[in-house]
Amino acid sequence: MDFGVKDGRIIGFGEYRGTREYDLSGAYVVPGLIDAHVHIESSLLAPAEYARLVLAHGTTTVIADPHEIANVCGAPGIDYMLAQGARTPLDILVMLPSCVPATPFDAGGAVLTAADLARFRGREGVVGLAEVMNVPGVLFGDEDLRAKMDLFEVVDGHAPFLSGKDLNAYIYAGVQSDHECTALPEAREKLLRGMYVMIREGSTERNLHDLLPLVDACTAPRCCFATDDRHADMLAGEGHIDDCVRKAVSGGLEVEQALRMATLSAAGRFGLHDRGALAPGRLADFCVADDPDRFRVLRTFKRGVEVVDAGYLPPACPKSPMHARVPEPGDIRITGRGEARVIEIVPGQITTRDLRYPVDAAGIPDLDRDILKAVVIDRYRATGSGVGLVHGFHLQEGAIAGSVSHDSHNIVAVGAGDADIVRAVAEVVRLGGGLAVVSGDDITALPLECAGLMSALPYDEVVRRLAALEEHARRLGAIANPFMYLSFLALTVIPEVRVTERGVFDVGAFTDVPLFEE
């Protein structure tokens, strides 16, 4: 069936004559795909390069939470993302960060109050309040958080494992969605209590397979896809929301329901009634696929115009605060003996487990039991470093470090020896922000000039350098996607235990705890 487009919108279906006509015979036309929740910064790409990459995969709208750059740069970071987004064909719609810092325990580069967010209200491209991570603040009536929620009609959630009456109270307070579900019973409870459930498939947060049974013809309108945190190499290799559609269909979901989640359901969740469907009056945002089951995107159209590669557009990067003091090996030495708290990495998830191991500090690293040292360095005020123990990185030598460390984005490192940890941290500081793998004098690195979070390089070069980092880390024995797991080690709003610039943090107890049990 033919359809016509005028001034960026679909005018109708039937026979129309146009100044330019496209023959799409034999292909399938699908509404432009929508990512319901993403941190663009996690791709390690500046917004223009991110747009180039995901547009090629049929995505025409992303709902972005810029809380990574906001934690580093404050309100100017949000201004940067809005301005950069306005320069791309991709619609980058912003949910304002609700928790900067993520918790009162986090030491980042900025604090954003309700008054700070109020100036963005009504600004073009701003659609609501992003994931409310401070669950205790909601439940116990934090006044500034309440004021932030009152600014916006659309409020996203972040409530891993929240259940029962606490979940009731969280929803009653005005939170409408969650993207943190990792198990089917949790997702069902939240859906039955009226929340939108965003099924997440990121580089390490791979929840689609486990949550797919949630979706059927009745529930699909309340479910959508989100990538949350997906590195550039995964975007280039596996895709974006098109990847979620393919995985859902191969997992047994009807293609119509998968496409609805990727389009109309996501648009409806955010009140974007101008997109998400091919209908008169809607934006002419659509992609062309070879087959709905394989769903290989061939072409993408934005407001009726085919999106072509406009070439590399160097970003005007915000300054990256970097006042970290590179530690001496003695600064990160631990002492003691006994039952130690050890952070266990959970493959395919960003949650961790709080383990207990008998440990003699003199025997760390313990390569036989895969117990390594994890270090977090304050990059904003040079106040020092915190040390914890981690199981699951599998490094047999060397160290990895980076300035991408949710949500405060201090410098985080894991290594099989103090000297290499120090070298890796020193390389990140030298770069002014970035990722590094170090083994002796052998160093592989990726500079992240934009706030220590995003690269100023074209996406294909970022993908190449990421591959070099991964290969170097692999030779040292590291787990796959080590930098994505590394980036979540200090995230104090995801259970069970973390490490910050102060030391070990118990998420359930919501407090700092000693490394060795007393």
From Swiss-Prot:
Its cofactor is Mn(2+). It comes from the Archaea. Gene3D superfamilies: Metal-dependent hydrolases (3.20.20.140), Urease, subunit C, domain 1 (2.30.40.10). Its EC number is 3.5.4.2. It holds the Pfam family Adenine_deam_C. It catalyses: adenine + H2O + H(+) = hypoxanthine + NH4(+). GO terms for biological process: adenine catabolic process. It is an enzyme of class 3 (hydrolase). GO terms for molecular function: adenine deaminase activity. Keywords: Hydrolase, Manganese. Belongs to the metallo-dependent hydrolases superfamily. Adenine deaminase family. This is Adenine deaminase. It comes from Methanoculleus marisnigri (strain ATCC 35101 / DSM 1498 / JR1).
